[in-house]
Amino acid sequence: MSLSLWQQCLARLHDELPATEFSMWIRPLQAELSDNTLALYAPNRFVLDWVRDKYLNNINVLLNDFCGMDAPLLRFEVGSKPLVQAISQPAQPHHKQVSAAPQQQVRSAPVRPSWDNSPAQAEHTYRSNVNPKHTFDNFVEGKSNQLARAAARQVADNPGGAYNPLFLYGGTGLGKTHLLHAVGNGIIARKPNAKVVYMHSERFVQDMVKALQNNAIEEFKRYYRSVDALLIDDIQFFANKERSQEEFFHTFNALLEGNQQIILTSDRYPKEINGVEDRLKSRFGWGLTVAIEPPELETRVAILMKKADENDIRLPGEVAFFIAKRLRSNVRELEGALNRVIANANFTGRSITIDFVREALRDLLALQEKLVTIDNIQKTVAEYYKIKVADLLSKRRSRSVARPRQMAMALAKELTNHSLPEIGDAFGGRDHTTVLHACRKIEQLREESHDIKEDFSNLIRTLSS
């Protein structure tokens, strides 16, 4: 039995699974075939449990397809073996691979940047910007952010490993910054002397400008290239800043060559960031790119309940559901609304009920209901897909019309409080089962198609802004 068996499995899994799933869970596996047993080695227990739970059946089916009655037994283990590396590593992206830094190399610790002599900077340490309050433990996981959290967790456990760089993207207030800090805290927890730097992209630009003004560009380079992990928020602000992009390009390459972790966030997919050089956007995708979507209803409720618990506030479940049903755009908006409710309750001494929330959030709820209507959804979707609203209401079944119609129905269910029959009536008198089918179809396509996933996220962001 040839060792190419696992390579055949990899090829099939690559074709069958969404690219993000394959990169996150299958690519890190290493394989060893001996004594009619195929041993799969996962980098940590988390990956092992996930693969065994989610993909065991897929792998067994492939082994049976390729080998029939001679299919090997499957065994999972945590770790790796030197002999395994060459035979089981999946194909890498088509870019020049950079070599790992020699094991004996010791990086000098980043010291206070010499280009900034302000009093505030004098107290600076290279990890002071990592917020200890943002951890994986208090990050509420749901379907919308599950992959992003799992990838971030693996990076924290194994910085500089499989997912480098890690690129997280999604709308404002969805938890990207929280995950950046959580990774930083995770790395520091495992290695207290780790050199972890978190910053907004504009700070990188400001530091570079100061370095140029003070003729200290070499110190600037040494500082940023000596970290163990560089976490940069809102990378889209590099747009049209050519000198900053040039310097970051070389910093990026140096960090990758030294197996130093890079994590970036943006409000959009890398290739959609305007004003950033193609060579940078290409590098952003070298590791793993994961979207964070607006939280679904159950996650929004869980976020509210956890936030209330952190504030020692008893929040009735029906109240959390009431708020979550009406405020859908992002986590920050949810937490802001809850803070407002809590403050009002403290000031007035009243119990938190649905009627009390209606009163405390009266203007916010009224604005939401005014902004997100079925009519508004139909107009926005029609404009997005460059069709007419009349097409959405018509009986036409061509894909160019049917898919936008399904998208609009799914958005109406997600963003309004209308029932399925009411939504159907608003779309040319369609039956509620048609609406239900549309919602399920869009949910399925969001799992299978990056384009549909992006369309849904973009439309929600537009309608919620």
Curated annotation (Swiss-Prot):
Which parts of this chain are annotated as the region Domain I, interacts with DnaA modulators? 1-84
| One term of GO molecular function | lipid binding
Query: Know anything about its domains from the record?
Result: Domain I is involved in oligomerization and binding regulators, domain II is flexibile and of varying length in different bacteria, domain III forms the AAA+ region, while domain IV binds dsDNA.
Protein's UniProt name: Chromosomal replication initiator protein DnaA
Mainly resides where? Answer: cytoplasm
What SMART domains does the database record attribute to this sequence?
A: AAA (SM00382), Bac_DnaA_C (SM00760)
This protein's species is: Pectobacterium carotovorum subsp. carotovorum (strain PC1)
Q: Which UniProt keywords apply?
A: ATP-binding, Cytoplasm, DNA replication, DNA-binding, Lipid-binding, Nucleotide-binding
Give Gene Ontology CC terms: cytoplasm; plasma membrane
Origin, by domain of life?
Bacteria
Q: Describe the task this protein carries out.
A: Plays an essential role in the initiation and regulation of chromosomal replication. ATP-DnaA binds to the origin of replication (oriC) to initiate formation of the DNA replication initiation complex once per cell cycle. Binds the DnaA box (a 9 base pair repeat at the origin) and separates the double-stranded (ds)DNA. Forms a right-handed helical filament on oriC DNA; dsDNA binds to the exterior of the filament while single-stranded (ss)DNA is stabiized in the filament's interior.
